[in-house]
Amino acid sequence: MEIALALKAVILGIVEGLTEFLPISSTGHLILAGQLLDFNDEKGKIFEIVIQFGAILAVCWEFRRRIANVLSGLTTDPKAQRFAINVIVATVPAIVLALVFGKWIKAHLFNPITVALAFIIGGVVILLAERRDARRGMVTNPRGNALLQAAKAGAPRIESVDDLNWRDALKVGLAQCFALVPGTSRSGATIIGGMLFGLSRQVATEFSFFLAIPVIFGATVYELYKARALLSVDDLGIFGIGFVFAFLSAFLCVRWLLRFVATHDFKPFAWYRIAFGIIVLATAYSGLIAWHA
């Protein structure tokens, strides 16, 4: 195995792991990184599927006890049944739209310019959502009775994943549909969508993680099946490297994000998205980087 190829696998694996669950779009970053590293051919696309699978397994491992409890209680525990129904309801809209428009989206929207514009628009939406929450009184450690009442009045109505009903799940699922546009971010769409629909930042983040499991796992199986003719034993080494680094970086990222959202908002990610999108557009139109359409 070439050292240069192995290094590309390491870089892309880390990029996938760090961006899959942050509201900054893993697909957008992989499209851009793949072009910069000249690793965006058909094998490169299969590689992306493999490292996405590594990232989603990291979430499964982090929430393994919760997943085991839900699976074991599907026939006896109403809470587990409701949770499973919510995940299914939230997953269906994106699957339906992907099956109908998936080919068109990949043919027309998977390019750096679309990604850059989605980065910027998504960043603005995050800022507006955070500003809305601040105006509603979702403040940290309010001081004084007046501020305390304001915080209570504007506080999220859902403070636990177990309190979600199917209508809440459907709203988050509809928000997830926006993530079909590369650069939008699946986690960003579900987290910000959840917050706008009354979920606390922590609940929206946790539910977003659980939604990623059926969505990414299903997409992985489907895409690998379609590309089965291109799979080769010779690629196991490079795929394995990317898989491992995606798993490890995603695992660390998920743990960090769960702690981060307990005391911070998403404004830093919004400004990052806007700045990164502007840089991509500037390099494209200046000719500094020859992004491919």
From Swiss-Prot:
Keywords: Antibiotic resistance, Cell inner membrane, Cell membrane, Cell shape, Cell wall biogenesis/degradation, Hydrolase, Membrane, Peptidoglycan synthesis, Transmembrane, Transmembrane helix. One of its GO terms (cellular component) is plasma membrane. It is found in: Cell inner membrane. Bacitracin is thought to be involved in the inhibition of peptidoglycan synthesis by sequestering undecaprenyl diphosphate, thereby reducing the pool of lipid carrier available. InterPro entries: UppP. Its main location: membrane. Catalyzes the dephosphorylation of undecaprenyl diphosphate (UPP). Confers resistance to bacitracin. Belongs to the UppP family. Its EC number is 3.6.1.27. One of its GO terms (molecular function) is undecaprenyl-diphosphatase activity. It holds the Pfam family BacA. It comes from Cupriavidus pinatubonensis (strain JMP 134 / LMG 1197) (Cupriavidus necator (strain JMP 134)). It is a multi-pass membrane protein. One of its GO terms (biological process) is regulation of cell shape. The chain crosses the membrane at residues 3-23, 43-63, 85-105, 109-129, 178-198, 203-223, 238-258, 269-289. This is Undecaprenyl-diphosphatase. The keyword Transmembrane helix applies.
